């Protein structure tokens, strides 16, 4: 009887692992497709955009996740009215009614504002296809849940780190801002989440739940080492990687008691040229 229960438990765990693996794979593929498309679009952008701090702000009249923006229509409006727009919320995030939605380099009457606002579509549901940063959030949540005390599944956490590594390497090819052009003229500027903020939002919860596990600490250090060697659009990206790697080592050394484990982590950190001590 005991062997039957053990077999059922084994089958349940295997099925659950396969299900989580499929979820991770689907999240990864959707985000990879979205990121690749954004990067390909950016490679064609060679125009500058003026500073917008002094432009007039116009506010959202709806609440919801900013999912779809009709850029073709907005560029048509920009051309016909001889204006430029700076869209303030990051596409895919939740927007509250009344917050600044866009800036314009000219004052707009009520009809023109409503015409522009009609090209912003909101939803009550988040989608990775519209917001690639949601994929980082979801994979991070899977890693954190896998390493929570009640579950303790380092295998799933390691798989999640592998997917994060590949997506971060792809994100490093992307600029921290995007523009919409027509005939090599930039009409619309889009805000995107900075790589530094994205990396911190990923690593802060992961450090909390993984700092006690030497295997996962090593895995994360190898992730940083790999990412530092990747092609990057911004030289500061490597500085942000180093900063997060240093924070990881600091937390790990404060949490791991085994001196041999600390020695192994320190050796890996040395490969990453981190200035760490064994105490």
Where do the PLM segments sit?
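Well-ordered secondary-structure scaffolds
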Residues: 1-279
